[in-house]
């Protein structure tokens, strides 16, 4: 008798995998185990909740029970997996255990909180539960410090500013989105945020936070201090790898998988933000969607290696949206930038004259798909 497939996690990757499995097999036993409620919500919406005056419960799209009925699943919400016995094919919680034929880790990634004095005063917005826990202080806060000027930090800074709050955006780097693109490309967004009223503290490092009567005092390494009502950590994500380590599979930055999404154990797979695919961590929607398609086939007996095409990454800053693709972080590219009132096109060219990366903004985003076709990968 088939023990079926167990998926640990209930986020976007887990749900996409369930949908793809059920397209091919309506009856294989499917069990999902997760620490949260397993209700569905759209994670990118978290970048806009404050300006849209949305509460955490407003984000829910489908209740867990409806999901289970629709796709013929066994769900175990609010359940912490404590151990995986890979040789015995058993998943354990504090009071239950489940046997499996195939196991999929879809455990996601956790927000990184800098290890500074007062770190417990930092809020994170990496999932619906985290927003639910801090929505009242965030809605009430007038002065907000966002630590981290990457994708999420930039999106949140614009959103809080649009909601009428006084926003300070801090980063160690000399420019925003520094891990994704050079300053001459990100400067358009940087200038727009400044024009909106966002106060940028670049080349700045947070040293400590302390509670004071008027809110929170944030002290920088330069010994300058600012007073705010709330501090948000947007300093990146760290793949959740603890369960994989307990199962004895190979872990690097994420759970190491090959082109078949298979870990070092033949019956354990990983997908989504927790996975490191052939050395790459790809915490974006499109690679997760494609991974789910291929993994569903392989779990059901197929043998199809994942092939990822050139893909767009979207920066969700509504007043100056950006799309980017390719190796935008490469330092050896020569950038050709055309900036006009309706938007920007920035092309990253190799020494051989090949298009290796591009960034487009505003009305020029309509040219993204044509550029994708000419991108050298």
Swiss-Prot record:
Pathway the protein contributes to: Nitrogen metabolism; nitric oxide reduction
Cellular-component GO terms for this entry: cytoplasm
Keyword vocabulary terms for this entry: Cytoplasm, FAD, Flavoprotein, NAD, Oxidoreductase
Pfam families listed in its UniProt record: Pyr_redox_2 (PF07992), Rbx_binding (PF18113)
Task performed by this protein: One of at least two accessory proteins for anaerobic nitric oxide (NO) reductase. Reduces the rubredoxin moiety of NO reductase.
Named cofactor requirement(s): FAD
Transmembrane segments: none
Keyword rRNA processing: no
Top-level enzyme category: oxidoreductase
NCBIfam families attached to this UniProt entry: PRK04965.1
UniProt-annotated location(s): Cytoplasm
Keyword Metal-binding on entry: no
Domain of life: Bacteria
Protein name in UniProt: Nitric oxide reductase FlRd-NAD(+) reductase
Enzyme Commission code: 1.18.1.-
Alphabetical list of HAMAP family matching this protein: NorW
Underlying gene: norW
InterPro entries documented for this protein: FAD-bd_OxRdtase, FAD/NAD-bd_sf, FAD/NAD-binding_dom, NO_rdtase_NorW, Rbx-bd
A GO molecular function held by the record: oxidoreductase activity, acting on iron-sulfur proteins as donors, NAD or NADP as acceptor
Catalysed transformations (reactions): 2 reduced [nitric oxide reductase rubredoxin domain] + NAD(+) + H(+) = 2 oxidized [nitric oxide reductase rubredoxin domain] + NADH
Major localization listed first in the record, in broad terms: cytoplasm
Protein family according to the UniProt entry: Belongs to the FAD-dependent oxidoreductase family.
């Amino acid at each position: 008798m088939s023990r079926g497939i167990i998926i640990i996690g209930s986020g976007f990757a887990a749900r996409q995998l369930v949908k793809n499995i059920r397209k091919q097999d309506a009856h294989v036993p499917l069990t999902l185990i997760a620490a949260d409620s397993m209700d569905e919500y759209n994670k990118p919406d978290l970048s806009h909740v404050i300006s849209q005056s949305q509460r955490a419960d407003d984000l829910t799209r489908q209740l867990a029970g409806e999901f289970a009925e629709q796709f013929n699943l066994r769900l175990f919400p609010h359940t912490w997996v404590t151990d995986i016995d890979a040789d015995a094919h058993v998943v354990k919680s504090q009071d239950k255990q489940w046997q499996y034929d195939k196991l999929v880790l879809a455990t996601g990634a956790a927000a990184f909180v800098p290890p500074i004095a007062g770190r417990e005063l930092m809020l994170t917005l990496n999932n619906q539960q985290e927003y639910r826990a801090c929505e009242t202080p965030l809605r009430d806060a007038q002065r907000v410090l966002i630590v981290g000027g990457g994708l999420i930090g930039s999106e949140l800074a614009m959103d809080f500013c649009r909601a009428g709050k006084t926003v300070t955006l801090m980063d160690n780097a000399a420019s925003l989105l520094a891990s994704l693109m050079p300053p001459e490309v990100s400067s358009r967004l940087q200038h727009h945020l400044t024009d909106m009223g966002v106060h940028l503290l670049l080349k700045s490092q947070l040293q400590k936070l302390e509670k004071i009567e008027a809110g929170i005092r944030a002290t920088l390494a330069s010994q300058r201090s600012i007073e705010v009502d709330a501090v948000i950590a947007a300093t990146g994500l760290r793949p959740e790898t603890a369960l994989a380590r307990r199962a004895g599979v190979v872990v690097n930055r994420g759970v190491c998988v090959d082109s078949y999404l298979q870990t070092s154990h033949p019956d354990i797979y990983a997908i989504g933000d927790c996975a490191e695919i052939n050395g790459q961590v790809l915490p974006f929607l499109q690679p997760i969607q494609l991974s789910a398609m291929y993994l569903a086939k392989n779990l059901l007996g197929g043998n199809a290696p994942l092939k990822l095409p050139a893909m767009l990454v979207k920066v969700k800053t509504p007043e100056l949206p950006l799309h980017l693709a390719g190796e935008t972080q490469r330092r050896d590219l020569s950038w050709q930038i055309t900036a006009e009132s309706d938007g920007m096109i920035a092309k990253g060219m190799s020494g051989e004259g090949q298009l290796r990366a591009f960034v487009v903004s505003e009305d020029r985003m309509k040219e993204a798909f044509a550029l994708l076709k000419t991108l050298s990968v």
